[in-house]
């Protein structure tokens, strides 16, 4: 951190790691000249749990419950990236019905993540009321998650080759009802947030990022699309079944905090369009590739597999999946940006290397540059518009 030696009246202030506006255990060392920000140094690592090293000592099946602790507000995406890697390494086909179920749950998770970004973001800039509104819709999404997966958070629902269970009876109708209701909720947000002059005063022209600058910093997700770059991995990589739906990439040219807000608000509407099309066109068939249940072929050939004693032992070994000796980078469009995994197999049931590319960690790097020469109160606005979760930043 560089502090000018000529000035004697500079103040160094610690923001966090226990401040409610830090969105987790983030610490900022801020150098102030009155109300003006001279420098800002983020201090990370308070929530580091060694997730990459844990992955290298677990099979994929054993590691699945861990990944929901990265971004604990969008756990479907961390599960999706964890099963997509082995599926591509092993050339495993996912049934069409399972792919549709995944897309529906991913978009519901995207909406839930954006909602829980919107409420605290508004609270950061002084508007407390929307915080209570967003929990009304978010609880409805969690009710749908609970009915489909058994858990409101930390679902552990995705499996290599499909999902853990089929959608329960009546779930599709309930989800369609939610979609119709939520569109009126988004219109309500537009009415009392987007057109609010005090809100516009706080976010318009604050934290501007140009398109070339966003690319140079490696930004992704709404941070990139709000700077005029139409880049969405759902369109670029053609994963799952997104090509079968009619939807548009949402983007803005301005690159400020207002643009990032507008991109996320409109993304929620696009997610509803995707969910409605998926629910109406969901095919029949299996929800899991049943051949993948045979993971360990040698064990299937072993006659002891069906022995009387094996059927009644209290603790059976978990199924294993041998990773072939090759490298693979797989990514998905998470609510915060590009969530990727660099996976190196070594003909073992354990990954030789499991490198996580978290969007929040990359997007956070531009914060010191954005807040320089801004006012102290603008730090909350800019940090809130980035949308970080420290679980995935520190891993």
UniProtKB/Swiss-Prot annotation:
GO MF annotations, alphabetized: NAD binding; oxidoreductase activity, acting on NAD(P)H, quinone or similar compound as acceptor; quinone binding
Sorted UniProt keywords: Chloroplast, Membrane, NAD, NADP, Plastid, Plastoquinone, Quinone, Thylakoid, Translocase, Transport
Protein name per its UniProtKB record: NAD(P)H-quinone oxidoreductase subunit H, chloroplastic
EC primary class: translocase
GO cellular component, one term: chloroplast thylakoid membrane
Quaternary assembly: NDH is composed of at least 16 different subunits, 5 of which are encoded in the nucleus.
PROSITE patterns for the chain: COMPLEX1_49K
SUPFAM superfamilies referenced in this protein's UniProt entry, alphabetically: HydB/Nqo4-like
NCBIfam families named in the record: PRK06075.1 (NF004739), PRK07415.1 (NF005649)
Record localization: Plastid, Chloroplast thylakoid membrane
InterPro entries: NADH_Q_OxRdtase_suD (IPR001135), NADH_UbQ_OxRdtase_49kDa_CS (IPR014029), NDH1_su_D/H (IPR022885), NiFe-Hase_large (IPR029014)
Substrates-to-products reaction catalysed: a plastoquinone + NADH + (n+1) H(+)(in) = a plastoquinol + NAD(+) + n H(+)(out); a plastoquinone + NADPH + (n+1) H(+)(in) = a plastoquinol + NADP(+) + n H(+)(out)
